[in-house]
């Protein structure tokens, strides 16, 4: 079948959206599989290792009464290892397969560093989304695998104590996250890590003007080191 895309090649290559999103799906036939309803191995696989979360965000739909059993936690590494091992490693973009994220916080899994390092050792460019609350220096000493990430994105929920608390219901959230990010920016240059650091910020209804304050927050964090939040 033909999907009817007739864009000029040079124009496509100059557009990041086409380069990073549409072209890969066209090249590996994923769009045709989707239209025809036939099976294809996923281009992206989300890994959700979080066991709990320190925040109680107003927009989150998780069940606060649900808990994992200790046996589930103990075998979590083997479960994610199996998913990684079963990857066929086919196609031009297989290395960019995995995203660690979730409705719960990934850093609450005691094997998170091990999961990341294993994926990295198998040739995958591991990426993770986190709220950054647990990203302390003591945590990093125990979870050195964090530094094997290709990319880490921090989800921001405000720009000061009040705005952070309004969303997360955690009074310490803003101060702890900002401190952790500053310490992380100072720590990375002392290692051999190639990690890239970025942020996400959810624009809640009526808060689009807050983006300026978020930029100021990022500017403050970036002032402490040559290693910076870069996207």
Which stretches of residues belong to each language-model region?
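Conserved alpha-helical substructure of the radical SAM core
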Residues: 2-152, 163-167, 175, 179, ...
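Flexible loop/hinge segments that line or gate small-molecule binding clefts
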Residues: 157-161
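Conserved C-terminal portion of the radical SAM core fold
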Residues: 91-101, 122-127, 147-156, 176-231
């Amino acid at each position: 079948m033909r999907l009817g895309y007739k864009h000029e090649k040079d124009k496509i290559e100059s557009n990041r959206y086409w380069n990073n999103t549409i072209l890969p799906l066209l090249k590996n036939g994923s769009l045709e599989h989707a239209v025809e309803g036939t099976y294809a191995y996923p281009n992206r696989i989300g890994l959700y290792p979080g066991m709990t979360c320190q925040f109680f965000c107003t927009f989150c739909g998780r069940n606060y009464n649900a808990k994992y059993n200790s046996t589930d936690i103990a075998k979590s590494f083997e479960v994610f290892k199996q998913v990684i091992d079963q990857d066929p490693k086919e196609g031009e973009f297989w290395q960019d397969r995995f995203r660690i994220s979730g409705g719960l916080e990934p850093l609450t899994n005691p094997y998170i560093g091990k999961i990341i390092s294993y994926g990295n050792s198998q040739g995958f460019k591991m990426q993770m989304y986190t709220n950054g609350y647990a990203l302390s220096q003591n945590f990093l000493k125990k979870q050195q695998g964090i530094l094997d990430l290709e990319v880490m994105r921090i989800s921001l929920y405000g720009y000061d104590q009040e705005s952070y608390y309004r969303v997360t219901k955690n009074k310490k959230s803003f101060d702890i996250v900002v401190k952790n990010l500053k310490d992380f920016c100072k720590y990375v240059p002392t290692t051999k890590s190639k990690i890239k650091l970025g942020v996400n910020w959810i624009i809640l209804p009526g808060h689009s003007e807050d983006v300026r304050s978020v930029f100021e927050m990022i500017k403050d964090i970036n002032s402490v080191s040559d290693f910076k939040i870069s996207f």
